[in-house]
Amino acid sequence: MPRPEKVQLVAELTDRFASSTAAVLTEYRGLSVAQLNELRRALNGDAEYTVVKNTLSKLAVRNAGLTELEPLLQGPSAVAFVRGDPVKAAKSLRDFARANNALVIKGGILEGKLLSAAEVAALADLESREVLLAKVAGAANAVLARAAGLFQAPLAQVARLAEALRAKQAES
């Protein structure tokens, strides 16, 4: 019979998996407590980094309906539960992994889709949501400005033609 503490912990993990926009699984073997705390600070509120027992995590991912994560839960595992921008969190994890070879990104899940370690790295290479939205807005603005110029050109030509006709009539 499971202990009440473990039942509660599985329920909390299930809730975190279900409510997070993304979750990135890592192997932290060889990292000191100070380095883990440094990683938590680097995530800067975009994600909550938690060291988890694999048996409890497997129960939680089953309960959350994310069974595709089970094969990644081997060896010393920790999970970054992303609440904010997944791109920022992936960048923070990638940068920390580059600086500390002991951190290995195993993979993750984003909005219900399983991500390999390479896909998490590709996510980290994306620009943030704000930058992408600014680029879309800039492109839309350029198209609208070009369209406005096209609509204004015939009006300007008509005005020049009317002025030329008026000048010609004034001469005659």
UniProtKB/Swiss-Prot annotation:
Part of the ribosomal stalk of the 50S ribosomal subunit. The N-terminus interacts with L11 and the large rRNA to form the base of the stalk. The C-terminus forms an elongated spine to which L12 dimers bind in a sequential fashion forming a multimeric L10(L12)X complex. Coiled coil: none annotated. Pfam families: Ribosomal_L10. It comes from the Bacteria. NCBIfam families: PRK00099.1-1. PROSITE patterns: RIBOSOMAL_L10. Keywords: Ribonucleoprotein, Ribosomal protein, RNA-binding, rRNA-binding. InterPro entries: Ribosomal_uL10 (IPR001790), Ribosomal_uL10-like_sf (IPR043141), Ribosomal_uL10_bac (IPR022973), Ribosomal_uL10_bac_type (IPR047865), Ribosomal_uL10_CS_bac (IPR002363). This is Large ribosomal subunit protein uL10. The lineage of its organism: Bacteria, Bacillati, Actinomycetota, Actinomycetes, Acidothermales. Forms part of the ribosomal stalk, playing a central role in the interaction of the ribosome with GTP-bound translation factors. It comes from Acidothermus cellulolyticus (strain ATCC 43068 / DSM 8971 / 11B). GO terms for biological process: translation. GO terms for cellular component: large ribosomal subunit. Belongs to the universal ribosomal protein uL10 family. GO terms for molecular function: large ribosomal subunit rRNA binding; structural constituent of ribosome.
